[in-house]
Amino acid sequence: MPEEALIGQMATYHEELAQAGVLLDASGLQSSAKGWRIRYAGGKRIVSDGPFAETKELIAGYTIIQVKSREEALAWAKRFPNPAGEAKDAEIEVRQLFELDDFGPSEAVDRFRDLGAGPRT
């Protein structure tokens, strides 16, 4: 669990995202002890219950924003609180989501559109 000070910093940051109208979703992830993995092997799906061996690279949460440019996303990302706590080494990863328009027209894409899937416009 993150310390109270970090939770406060994260709350402030996410409030700023919401006030700017760019926050779509955000949440922390519980320990892998409460999760599972599914491995695909040929036609089989093999379920492994957590906990999993801790790795150096751990996804502990996510924040999804919708902005107009890479530069705007980078500016927000640089303001993200250090997830390990100030003065400690840490790293966050920023990636762009696919939008349905990134795919060519198809019946499958239309089915996702009908679900209302994808970022809000």
Segments predicted by a language model, with ranges:
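Conserved, structured core segments of small domains
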Residues: 1-121
